[in-house]
Amino acid sequence: MAASVVCRAATAGAQVLLRARRSPALLRTPALRSTATFAQALQFVPETQVSLLDNGLRVASEQSSQPTCTVGVWIDVGSRFETEKNNGAGYFLEHLAFKGTKNRPGSALEKEVESMGAHLNAYSTREHTAYYIKALSKDLPKAVELLGDIVQNCSLEDSQIEKERDVILREMQENDASMRDVVFNYLHATAFQGTPLAQAVEGPSENVRKLSRADLTEYLSTHYKAPRMVLAAAGGVEHQQLLDLAQKHLGGIPWTYAEDAVPTLTPCRFTGSEIRHRDDALPFAHVAIAVEGPGWASPDNVALQVANAIIGHYDCTYGGGVHLSSPLASGAVANKLCQSFQTFSICYAETGLLGAHFVCDRMKIDDMMFVLQGQWMRLCTSATESEVARGKNILRNALVSHLDGTTPVCEDIGRSLLTYGRRIPLAEWESRIAEVDASVVREICSKYIYDQCPAVAGYGPIEQLPDYNRIRSGMFWLRF
């Protein structure tokens, strides 16, 4: 009996293949394909739906079959919108958001979140602020209600402000122990000196000690406006339900400004410069070097991300040794140049930072800087098709793996609508990546890196960090 079943199955399969040979179109149907290309697979990614409330607040969602969801409010405000006087106000408000609202004391807010088994979080950057909740899909109505209450009705009680002031000051002391965070704050301070982007998200400790309830109230009334907000959700959510909940709980957020005092985004200039903080008591030197990169909307971003993928990243705990695909990584292993390095591309509205950060022994700083700049110059002058193909595949993998889960997808939706005005589909990103070849990488790298003045930040035992003029001379090659 079993043999006859197998025989009939084989006969049926042969008949299908025979029909496919006669009609090649059959081979293009998903049922007869064993695999789909990367570009074809991206066509089946769920669509992002976007709607607009009457007050200008945008509502966006991506529905999937997951039993959980992440929903959050992304706001177009960060430390670059602050002044020297109120720098740190946004970070302060982020902390106060969990301490209760006018409708819910802090203990009641915590109990409601815990009773759902949900996770409530928030973060601030130089351009954006976000509040989000990850919960079961059935708890979406309660999650949106809580977010609406947090964004609109923060209690700002004097006792909570004083208590949180001490918490933030302790956090700032802990952050100072993170050498990487310190170096990147130094890098922004020197690269964008004299502009709002130089300001740290946390603000200076003097401001944290002086910020008052009136300062925080003014910050809220100035920046928390509906047209600058996005309610984003991902996972097991229905867009119409989300839209109805947004109208109910966020539809009352104001959209007008007193006396038309609309905040404007101050353009930030890049300055090639350096900042050095020498501390020989520390075991390793942390150094960051960057040139001015493009803003969010620039078409050059994809080619520069491919270039960063070619240079790659490295940590001494990695396996592979000298067989790593990145020439800089294999060289770092062979010559014991560093403990770790990573490339980065930090984008803002109209500018950015494109560079690398490395951690190394005090006697290897000069060598590591020389090799890193040599790799930059090689990309500008002689990037090859094979390494560009490798960089494109690395970027494709990062693009997809970054969106694994409802929280990363929700964050991508919220940030994309604030920066691009829309969510760029993965298929469109793939087409942009596919257009990059070696000539494009050489051209774009030459535009942003070759013979450009860098910003440099060093922290730790950095006596051997080369003089700025030497570093600047490493940004070009004499060619005949």
Swiss-Prot record:
It is a peripheral membrane protein. Keywords: Acetylation, Disease variant, Electron transport, Membrane, Mitochondrion, Mitochondrion inner membrane, Neuropathy, Parkinsonism, Phosphoprotein, Respiratory chain, Transit peptide, Transport. The modification N6-acetyllysine is found at residues 111, 138, 163, 248. This is Cytochrome b-c1 complex subunit 1, mitochondrial. The keyword Lipid metabolism does not apply. InterPro entries: Metalloenz_LuxS/M16 (IPR011249), MPP/UQCRC_Complex (IPR050361), Pept_M16_N (IPR011765), Peptidase_M16_C (IPR007863). It is linked to Parkinsonism with polyneuropathy: An autosomal dominant disorder characterized by late-onset, levodopa-responsive parkinsonism with asymmetric tremor, rigidity and bradykinesia. Patients also manifest a sensorimotor polyneuropathy with variable degrees of distal legs and hands muscle atrophy and weakness, and absent deep tendon reflexes. Residues 1-34 form a transit peptide. The gene is UQCRC1. GO terms for cellular component: mitochondrial inner membrane; mitochondrion; respiratory chain complex; respiratory chain complex III. Belongs to the peptidase M16 family. UQCRC1/QCR1 subfamily. It is found in: Mitochondrion inner membrane. Component of the ubiquinol-cytochrome c oxidoreductase, a multisubunit transmembrane complex that is part of the mitochondrial electron transport chain which drives oxidative phosphorylation. It comes from Homo sapiens (Human). Coiled coil: none annotated. GO terms for molecular function: metal ion binding; protein-containing complex binding; ubiquinol-cytochrome-c reductase activity; ubiquitin protein ligase binding. Component of the ubiquinol-cytochrome c oxidoreductase (cytochrome b-c1 complex, complex III, CIII), a multisubunit enzyme composed of 11 subunits. The complex is composed of 3 respiratory subunits cytochrome b, cytochrome c1 and Rieske protein UQCRFS1, 2 core protein subunits UQCRC1/QCR1 and UQCRC2/QCR2, and 6 low-molecular weight protein subunits UQCRH/QCR6, UQCRB/QCR7, UQCRQ/QCR8, UQCR10/QCR9, UQCR11/QCR10 and subunit 9, the cleavage product of Rieske protein UQCRFS1. Expressed in brain, including substantia nigra, striatum, cortex and cerebellum, and in spinal cord, heart, kidney, liver and muscle. Pfam families: Peptidase_M16, Peptidase_M16_C. The keyword ATP-binding does not apply. The modification N6-succinyllysine is found at residue 163.
